[in-house]
Regions:
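Conserved beta-ketoacyl condensing-enzyme motif
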Residues: 6, 30-160, 189-198, 294-308
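Phosphate/pyrophosphate-binding loops at sites that engage ATP/ADP/AMP, CoA/4′-phosphopantetheine
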Residues: 83-95, 244-249, 281-297, 319-323
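Active-site-proximal alpha-helical scaffold in enzymes
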Residues: 76-88, 138-142, 146-190, 228-249, ...
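Conserved small-residue
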Residues: 8, 26, 80, 101, ...
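ACP-dependent fatty acid/polyketide chain-elongation machinery
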Residues: 1-63, 242-252, 350-363, 407-411
Length: 411
Protein backbone atom coordinates (compact mmCIF):
# COMPACT_ATOMS: atom_id res chain seq x y z
CA UNK A 1 0.00 0.00 0.00
CA UNK A 2 1.48 3.30 -1.10
CA UNK A 3 1.48 6.15 1.41
CA UNK A 4 1.49 9.89 0.70
CA UNK A 5 3.17 12.70 2.62
CA UNK A 6 3.44 16.49 2.38
CA UNK A 7 7.03 17.55 1.71
CA UNK A 8 6.74 21.11 0.39
CA UNK A 9 4.56 24.19 0.87
CA UNK A 10 4.27 27.37 -1.21
CA UNK A 11 2.05 30.25 -0.13
CA UNK A 12 1.07 33.55 -1.74
CA UNK A 13 -1.60 35.11 0.50
CA UNK A 14 -2.97 38.41 1.81
CA UNK A 15 -0.81 37.77 4.88
CA UNK A 16 2.32 37.89 2.73
CA UNK A 17 4.27 36.32 -0.09
CA UNK A 18 6.04 33.17 1.07
CA UNK A 19 5.31 30.46 3.62
CA UNK A 20 7.30 31.97 6.48
CA UNK A 21 5.74 35.44 6.30
CA UNK A 22 2.20 34.12 5.94
CA UNK A 23 2.57 31.59 8.78
CA UNK A 24 4.11 34.06 11.21
CA UNK A 25 1.41 36.65 10.56
CA UNK A 26 -1.31 34.01 10.88
CA UNK A 27 -0.02 32.77 14.25
CA UNK A 28 0.37 36.35 15.45
CA UNK A 29 -3.32 36.98 14.79
CA UNK A 30 -2.70 39.50 12.03
CA UNK A 31 -5.33 40.32 9.40
CA UNK A 32 -4.45 40.68 5.71
CA UNK A 33 -7.72 42.39 4.80
CA UNK A 34 -7.72 46.10 3.98
CA UNK A 35 -9.19 48.75 1.69
CA UNK A 36 -9.02 47.70 -1.96
CA UNK A 37 -6.14 49.31 -3.84
CA UNK A 38 -6.40 47.52 -7.21
CA UNK A 39 -9.23 49.72 -8.50
CA UNK A 40 -11.54 52.58 -7.55
CA UNK A 41 -14.38 51.23 -5.39
CA UNK A 42 -16.28 54.51 -5.00
CA UNK A 43 -19.30 53.20 -6.93
CA UNK A 44 -19.24 49.80 -5.19
CA UNK A 45 -21.07 48.76 -2.03
CA UNK A 46 -18.02 46.79 -0.81
CA UNK A 47 -14.63 48.46 -0.43
CA UNK A 48 -12.45 45.84 1.28
CA UNK A 49 -10.65 42.63 0.31
CA UNK A 50 -7.64 40.48 1.08
CA UNK A 51 -5.15 41.61 -1.57
CA UNK A 52 -1.59 40.31 -2.00
CA UNK A 53 0.17 43.65 -1.93
CA UNK A 54 3.78 42.46 -1.67
CA UNK A 55 3.68 40.14 -4.72
CA UNK A 56 6.07 40.90 -7.58
CA UNK A 57 5.57 38.51 -10.52
CA UNK A 58 9.04 39.35 -11.86
CA UNK A 59 10.49 37.45 -8.89
CA UNK A 60 9.15 34.26 -10.49
CA UNK A 61 8.42 34.95 -14.17
CA UNK A 62 10.30 36.63 -17.01
CA UNK A 63 9.01 40.16 -17.53
CA UNK A 64 8.10 39.60 -21.18
CA UNK A 65 5.95 36.59 -20.26
CA UNK A 66 3.89 38.26 -17.54
CA UNK A 67 1.40 39.93 -19.90
CA UNK A 68 0.48 36.49 -21.28
CA UNK A 69 -0.65 35.28 -17.86
CA UNK A 70 -3.70 36.00 -15.75
CA UNK A 71 -2.93 36.96 -12.16
CA UNK A 72 -4.28 33.60 -10.97
CA UNK A 73 -1.69 31.83 -13.14
CA UNK A 74 1.05 34.12 -11.84
CA UNK A 75 0.11 33.15 -8.29
CA UNK A 76 0.05 29.45 -9.22
CA UNK A 77 3.50 29.57 -10.81
CA UNK A 78 4.97 31.49 -7.88
CA UNK A 79 3.49 29.20 -5.22
CA UNK A 80 4.59 26.12 -7.19
CA UNK A 81 8.17 27.37 -7.34
CA UNK A 82 8.04 28.20 -3.62
CA UNK A 83 6.69 24.72 -2.79
CA UNK A 84 9.32 22.87 -4.84
CA UNK A 85 12.07 24.97 -3.26
CA UNK A 86 10.66 24.22 0.19
CA UNK A 87 10.62 20.50 -0.66
CA UNK A 88 14.18 20.73 -1.98
CA UNK A 89 12.95 18.73 -4.96
CA UNK A 90 14.32 19.23 -8.46
CA UNK A 91 12.39 18.10 -11.51
CA UNK A 92 14.75 16.52 -14.05
CA UNK A 93 14.33 14.84 -17.45
CA UNK A 94 14.67 11.53 -15.61
CA UNK A 95 11.81 12.08 -13.14
CA UNK A 96 9.56 14.59 -14.96
CA UNK A 97 7.06 11.99 -16.18
CA UNK A 98 6.42 10.89 -12.57
CA UNK A 99 5.65 14.44 -11.37
CA UNK A 100 2.09 15.69 -11.88
CA UNK A 101 0.19 18.94 -11.40
CA UNK A 102 -3.38 19.49 -10.20
CA UNK A 103 -4.15 23.11 -9.33
CA UNK A 104 -7.74 24.23 -8.91
CA UNK A 105 -9.40 27.59 -9.44
CA UNK A 106 -12.98 28.65 -9.01
CA UNK A 107 -13.13 31.47 -11.55
CA UNK A 108 -9.77 31.80 -13.32
CA UNK A 109 -8.64 34.86 -15.26
CA UNK A 110 -11.36 37.32 -14.34
CA UNK A 111 -8.90 40.22 -14.60
CA UNK A 112 -8.08 39.23 -18.18
CA UNK A 113 -11.74 38.76 -19.10
CA UNK A 114 -12.60 42.25 -17.84
CA UNK A 115 -9.62 43.81 -19.60
CA UNK A 116 -10.30 42.20 -22.97
CA UNK A 117 -14.10 42.62 -22.94
CA UNK A 118 -13.52 46.33 -22.28
CA UNK A 119 -11.25 46.45 -25.36
CA UNK A 120 -13.85 44.60 -27.42
CA UNK A 121 -16.65 47.00 -26.47
CA UNK A 122 -14.64 50.22 -26.65
CA UNK A 123 -12.20 49.55 -29.50
CA UNK A 124 -13.58 46.63 -31.48
CA UNK A 125 -12.64 42.97 -32.02
CA UNK A 126 -9.28 43.61 -33.69
CA UNK A 127 -7.93 45.07 -30.44
CA UNK A 128 -8.59 41.92 -28.39
CA UNK A 129 -5.32 40.29 -27.35
CA UNK A 130 -4.33 36.98 -28.98
CA UNK A 131 -3.43 35.89 -25.45
CA UNK A 132 -6.96 36.56 -24.17
CA UNK A 133 -8.24 32.98 -24.18
CA UNK A 134 -5.07 31.16 -23.01
CA UNK A 135 -4.56 33.77 -20.29
CA UNK A 136 -8.11 33.48 -18.96
CA UNK A 137 -9.07 29.79 -19.09
CA UNK A 138 -9.00 28.00 -15.76
CA UNK A 139 -6.88 24.99 -16.78
CA UNK A 140 -3.91 27.33 -17.20
CA UNK A 141 -3.47 27.25 -13.41
CA UNK A 142 -2.05 23.75 -13.80
CA UNK A 143 -0.94 24.14 -17.39
CA UNK A 144 1.33 27.10 -16.79
CA UNK A 145 2.68 25.81 -13.49
CA UNK A 146 3.67 22.52 -15.12
CA UNK A 147 5.29 24.32 -18.06
CA UNK A 148 7.34 26.57 -15.80
CA UNK A 149 8.72 23.71 -13.70
CA UNK A 150 8.77 20.90 -16.28
CA UNK A 151 6.30 18.47 -14.69
CA UNK A 152 5.07 15.94 -17.28
CA UNK A 153 2.85 13.68 -15.18
CA UNK A 154 -0.94 13.90 -14.69
CA UNK A 155 -2.06 17.47 -15.35
CA UNK A 156 -5.52 18.93 -14.81
CA UNK A 157 -7.47 21.70 -13.14
CA UNK A 158 -10.37 21.01 -10.79
CA UNK A 159 -13.23 23.54 -10.76
CA UNK A 160 -15.56 23.08 -7.78
CA UNK A 161 -15.93 26.70 -6.64
CA UNK A 162 -14.62 27.12 -3.10
CA UNK A 163 -13.74 23.41 -2.84
CA UNK A 164 -11.42 23.49 -5.89
CA UNK A 165 -8.12 23.58 -3.99
CA UNK A 166 -9.12 20.80 -1.60
CA UNK A 167 -10.45 18.59 -4.39
CA UNK A 168 -7.18 19.16 -6.26
CA UNK A 169 -5.10 17.98 -3.32
CA UNK A 170 -7.44 15.03 -2.78
CA UNK A 171 -7.23 14.01 -6.43
CA UNK A 172 -3.43 14.36 -6.32
CA UNK A 173 -3.35 12.13 -3.23
CA UNK A 174 -5.33 9.51 -5.14
CA UNK A 175 -3.07 9.81 -8.20
CA UNK A 176 -0.08 8.82 -6.07
CA UNK A 177 -2.02 6.00 -4.38
CA UNK A 178 -2.92 4.68 -7.85
CA UNK A 179 0.76 4.85 -8.93
CA UNK A 180 0.13 7.43 -11.65
CA UNK A 181 2.86 9.60 -10.14
CA UNK A 182 5.43 9.68 -7.34
CA UNK A 183 5.21 13.43 -6.76
CA UNK A 184 2.24 15.75 -7.25
CA UNK A 185 2.10 19.54 -7.20
CA UNK A 186 -1.38 20.35 -5.90
CA UNK A 187 -3.48 23.17 -4.49
CA UNK A 188 -5.52 26.15 -5.56
CA UNK A 189 -5.24 29.70 -6.86
CA UNK A 190 -7.57 32.65 -7.33
CA UNK A 191 -7.42 36.34 -8.34
CA UNK A 192 -10.93 37.76 -8.33
CA UNK A 193 -10.41 41.05 -6.49
CA UNK A 194 -11.61 42.87 -9.59
CA UNK A 195 -14.51 45.23 -10.29
CA UNK A 196 -16.83 42.51 -11.58
CA UNK A 197 -15.71 40.03 -8.93
CA UNK A 198 -16.53 42.40 -6.10
CA UNK A 199 -19.76 43.58 -7.74
CA UNK A 200 -20.97 40.07 -8.51
CA UNK A 201 -20.47 38.68 -5.02
CA UNK A 202 -21.73 41.90 -3.41
CA UNK A 203 -24.95 41.86 -5.44
CA UNK A 204 -25.39 38.21 -4.47
CA UNK A 205 -25.37 39.48 -0.86
CA UNK A 206 -22.50 37.09 -0.12
CA UNK A 207 -19.95 39.71 0.99
CA UNK A 208 -19.66 41.47 4.32
CA UNK A 209 -20.66 45.12 4.27
CA UNK A 210 -18.79 45.83 7.50
CA UNK A 211 -16.68 48.93 6.74
CA UNK A 212 -13.87 47.93 9.14
CA UNK A 213 -11.49 45.73 7.11
CA UNK A 214 -9.84 44.21 10.18
CA UNK A 215 -13.16 43.21 11.77
CA UNK A 216 -15.32 42.30 8.76
CA UNK A 217 -14.36 38.62 8.42
CA UNK A 218 -15.60 37.21 11.73
CA UNK A 219 -16.38 33.51 11.41
CA UNK A 220 -18.83 31.90 13.86
CA UNK A 221 -19.77 35.19 15.58
CA UNK A 222 -23.35 36.36 16.11
CA UNK A 223 -22.85 39.48 13.99
CA UNK A 224 -21.13 37.89 10.98
CA UNK A 225 -22.66 39.18 7.77
CA UNK A 226 -20.77 37.63 4.86
CA UNK A 227 -17.32 36.73 3.63
CA UNK A 228 -14.49 39.00 2.53
CA UNK A 229 -12.99 38.23 -0.87
CA UNK A 230 -9.30 37.30 -0.90
CA UNK A 231 -6.70 36.36 -3.50
CA UNK A 232 -3.57 34.22 -3.69
CA UNK A 233 -2.47 30.60 -3.97
CA UNK A 234 -1.51 27.66 -1.82
CA UNK A 235 0.46 24.75 -3.27
CA UNK A 236 1.59 21.52 -1.62
CA UNK A 237 4.15 19.02 -2.82
CA UNK A 238 2.70 15.58 -2.17
CA UNK A 239 5.10 12.67 -2.38
CA UNK A 240 5.01 8.91 -2.14
CA UNK A 241 6.49 8.05 1.25
CA UNK A 242 9.38 5.81 0.14
CA UNK A 243 10.31 8.31 -2.56
CA UNK A 244 10.44 11.05 0.07
CA UNK A 245 12.42 8.96 2.56
CA UNK A 246 14.95 7.94 -0.07
CA UNK A 247 15.91 11.55 -0.69
CA UNK A 248 15.77 12.56 2.98
CA UNK A 249 12.86 14.97 2.57
CA UNK A 250 11.30 16.85 5.47
CA UNK A 251 7.81 15.49 6.09
CA UNK A 252 5.15 17.89 7.39
CA UNK A 253 2.33 15.36 7.70
CA UNK A 254 0.86 12.26 6.10
CA UNK A 255 -2.22 12.53 3.89
CA UNK A 256 -4.52 9.70 4.96
CA UNK A 257 -8.10 10.53 3.99
CA UNK A 258 -10.18 12.36 1.41
CA UNK A 259 -13.93 12.78 1.33
CA UNK A 260 -16.04 14.37 -1.40
CA UNK A 261 -19.82 14.61 -1.64
CA UNK A 262 -22.58 16.69 -3.21
CA UNK A 263 -25.54 18.38 -1.54
CA UNK A 264 -27.97 18.29 -4.50
CA UNK A 265 -29.74 21.12 -2.69
CA UNK A 266 -29.13 24.71 -3.86
CA UNK A 267 -26.82 26.76 -6.09
CA UNK A 268 -25.32 28.82 -3.27
CA UNK A 269 -26.73 27.64 0.07
CA UNK A 270 -25.49 24.62 2.07
CA UNK A 271 -27.87 21.77 2.84
CA UNK A 272 -29.71 22.02 6.16
CA UNK A 273 -27.58 20.91 9.07
CA UNK A 274 -24.55 20.47 6.83
CA UNK A 275 -25.70 16.98 5.84
CA UNK A 276 -23.43 16.81 2.78
CA UNK A 277 -20.41 18.11 4.67
CA UNK A 278 -20.99 15.54 7.43
CA UNK A 279 -20.97 12.71 4.89
CA UNK A 280 -17.72 14.00 3.38
CA UNK A 281 -16.08 14.16 6.82
CA UNK A 282 -17.15 10.57 7.52
CA UNK A 283 -15.75 9.48 4.15
CA UNK A 284 -12.35 11.03 4.92
CA UNK A 285 -12.27 9.39 8.36
CA UNK A 286 -13.17 6.00 6.90
CA UNK A 287 -10.48 6.11 4.21
CA UNK A 288 -7.88 7.06 6.81
CA UNK A 289 -9.03 4.45 9.36
CA UNK A 290 -9.39 7.35 11.78
CA UNK A 291 -11.32 7.06 15.02
CA UNK A 292 -13.34 10.25 15.64
CA UNK A 293 -11.65 10.78 19.01
CA UNK A 294 -8.23 10.94 17.29
CA UNK A 295 -9.13 14.23 15.58
CA UNK A 296 -7.75 17.18 17.53
CA UNK A 297 -7.94 20.05 15.05
CA UNK A 298 -10.15 21.13 12.16
CA UNK A 299 -9.40 23.98 9.78
CA UNK A 300 -13.04 24.73 9.01
CA UNK A 301 -14.43 26.30 5.87
CA UNK A 302 -15.78 29.00 8.18
CA UNK A 303 -16.64 31.67 5.63
CA UNK A 304 -18.25 34.15 8.07
CA UNK A 305 -21.63 33.83 6.34
CA UNK A 306 -24.72 33.21 8.48
CA UNK A 307 -25.62 29.97 6.69
CA UNK A 308 -22.21 28.32 6.31
CA UNK A 309 -20.89 28.69 9.83
CA UNK A 310 -24.06 27.43 11.51
CA UNK A 311 -24.44 24.44 9.20
CA UNK A 312 -20.75 23.52 9.25
CA UNK A 313 -20.78 23.61 13.04
CA UNK A 314 -23.76 21.26 13.01
CA UNK A 315 -22.00 18.92 10.54
CA UNK A 316 -19.01 18.65 12.89
CA UNK A 317 -21.31 17.89 15.84
CA UNK A 318 -23.19 15.29 13.78
CA UNK A 319 -19.98 13.38 13.04
CA UNK A 320 -18.12 13.77 16.32
CA UNK A 321 -20.88 14.01 18.93
CA UNK A 322 -19.57 15.10 22.33
CA UNK A 323 -15.97 14.87 21.08
CA UNK A 324 -16.71 17.86 18.82
CA UNK A 325 -16.38 20.11 21.87
CA UNK A 326 -12.83 18.85 22.48
CA UNK A 327 -11.62 19.62 18.96
CA UNK A 328 -9.88 22.90 18.19
CA UNK A 329 -11.90 24.28 15.27
CA UNK A 330 -10.71 27.42 13.52
CA UNK A 331 -11.36 29.48 10.44
CA UNK A 332 -8.27 31.19 9.11
CA UNK A 333 -10.51 33.24 6.80
CA UNK A 334 -10.74 35.85 9.54
CA UNK A 335 -7.09 36.56 8.72
CA UNK A 336 -6.92 35.91 4.97
CA UNK A 337 -10.41 36.49 3.67
CA UNK A 338 -11.93 33.88 1.37
CA UNK A 339 -9.69 32.85 -1.53
CA UNK A 340 -12.48 30.85 -3.20
CA UNK A 341 -10.71 28.21 -5.32
CA UNK A 342 -7.44 29.07 -3.59
CA UNK A 343 -8.82 28.61 -0.07
CA UNK A 344 -8.36 24.85 0.12
CA UNK A 345 -4.73 25.15 -0.95
CA UNK A 346 -3.68 27.62 1.72
CA UNK A 347 -5.79 25.95 4.40
CA UNK A 348 -4.36 22.48 3.72
CA UNK A 349 -0.93 24.08 4.06
CA UNK A 350 -1.98 25.59 7.40
CA UNK A 351 -3.17 22.14 8.52
CA UNK A 352 0.15 20.52 7.57
CA UNK A 353 2.16 23.18 9.40
CA UNK A 354 -0.13 23.03 12.43
CA UNK A 355 0.47 19.29 12.74
CA UNK A 356 4.21 19.67 12.13
CA UNK A 357 4.71 22.41 14.72
CA UNK A 358 2.04 21.41 17.23
CA UNK A 359 0.20 24.73 17.13
CA UNK A 360 -3.33 25.72 16.11
CA UNK A 361 -3.73 29.14 14.45
CA UNK A 362 -6.43 31.39 15.92
CA UNK A 363 -9.80 32.43 14.63
CA UNK A 364 -9.60 36.19 15.01
CA UNK A 365 -12.45 38.61 15.81
CA UNK A 366 -14.04 36.23 18.32
CA UNK A 367 -15.81 38.77 20.54
CA UNK A 368 -19.53 38.11 20.04
CA UNK A 369 -20.42 34.41 20.37
CA UNK A 370 -23.33 32.88 18.46
CA UNK A 371 -25.28 30.27 20.48
CA UNK A 372 -25.71 28.26 17.26
CA UNK A 373 -21.91 28.11 16.85
CA UNK A 374 -20.83 26.67 20.18
CA UNK A 375 -17.62 24.73 19.48
CA UNK A 376 -14.12 25.74 20.57
CA UNK A 377 -12.93 28.10 17.83
CA UNK A 378 -9.40 28.86 19.13
CA UNK A 379 -10.37 32.48 19.83
CA UNK A 380 -7.95 35.26 18.94
CA UNK A 381 -4.70 33.57 20.03
CA UNK A 382 -2.76 30.62 18.63
CA UNK A 383 -2.68 27.62 20.91
CA UNK A 384 -0.15 24.82 21.30
CA UNK A 385 -1.57 21.33 20.88
CA UNK A 386 -0.11 17.98 19.92
CA UNK A 387 -2.26 17.13 16.89
CA UNK A 388 -2.50 13.46 15.98
CA UNK A 389 -5.05 13.96 13.19
CA UNK A 390 -6.45 17.13 11.64
CA UNK A 391 -9.00 17.93 8.96
CA UNK A 392 -9.34 20.69 6.38
CA UNK A 393 -12.89 21.42 5.21
CA UNK A 394 -13.93 23.15 1.97
CA UNK A 395 -17.55 23.62 0.91
CA UNK A 396 -18.38 25.25 -2.42
CA UNK A 397 -21.25 26.87 -4.29
CA UNK A 398 -23.07 24.12 -6.17
CA UNK A 399 -23.03 21.82 -3.16
CA UNK A 400 -19.42 20.64 -3.46
CA UNK A 401 -18.01 19.27 -0.17
CA UNK A 402 -14.36 18.25 0.10
CA UNK A 403 -12.48 17.14 3.21
CA UNK A 404 -8.81 16.24 3.71
CA UNK A 405 -7.48 14.27 6.68
CA UNK A 406 -3.80 14.58 7.64
CA UNK A 407 -2.03 12.55 10.31
CA UNK A 408 1.17 13.29 12.19
CA UNK A 409 3.95 11.32 10.51
CA UNK A 410 5.65 8.88 12.85
CA UNK A 411 7.47 6.64 10.42
Amino acid sequence: MRRVVVTGIGLITPLGTGKEKTWKNLLDGKCGIDKITAFDTSEHTVHIAGEVNDFNPEDYIEKKEIKKLGRFSQFAIAATKEALADAKFEITPENAERVGTIIGSGIGGLDIIEQEITKLVEKGPKKVSPFYIPAAILNMASGNASIYVGAKGPNKTVVTACASGTNSIGDAFQAILLNKADVMIAGGTEATVTPSGIAGFANLKALSTNPDPKKASRPFTADRDGFVLGEGAGILVLEELEHAKKRGAKIYAEVVGYGETGDAYHMTAPSDGGEGAARAIKMALEQGNIKPEEVGYINAHGTSTPANDKNETQAIKTVFGEHAYKIGVNSTKGSTGHLLGGAGGIEAAFLAMAIDEGVMPPTINQDNPDPACDLYYIPNKAEKRDIEVGLSNSLGFGGHNAILAFRKYKG
